[in-house]
Amino acid sequence: VPQSTIDALRALQANGVKIFICTGRPPAQMSVVLNTIPVDFDGIVGFNGQYCVDGSGFLEKHALDATDVATIVRWLDEHEDIVACIGEEDYVYFNHSNDQMRRTWASLGKTAPDVFFDDPHVRTAEHETFQMSPYISRDQEAELLSLLPNTRGVRWHPDFVDLIPAD
């Protein structure tokens, strides 16, 4: 982050303006980013807006629809080669790994969070899921979204799509 940006953020705070970091990342993966920016943010808007928190304890969150999550997990079962990143409030994991995922993760450099693997059948049944990011093509995205009435896709990278609540 350029020093001019850091100076500008600090000047805003000195003038009473609250600053938030807004990202598609989940709170559980924010420390690797926040550790590279020497600014104390007043809050986080994470998971593409699905999880918002500030330093005073305010929290607003909106998880994926449980029926849509179950449909996505079944779809992943039918497409065993597809890797997906699955985000909960305090934990982010992959269903498995492949070369495409490893290349993408390596491109994050020092902002790449730790990678964990888990069973989405178990985790999604026991924990709210805020975002699922399968490594799929645009055609596969259209196929999957046609099955999900309460979910939309947000794509900022050619290798994967972030699936978030539609509303």
Region locations from a protein language model:
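Active-site phosphate-binding/coordination module
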Residues: 5-103
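Conserved acidic, metal-coordinating active-site core of Asp-based
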Residues: 81-83, 87-167
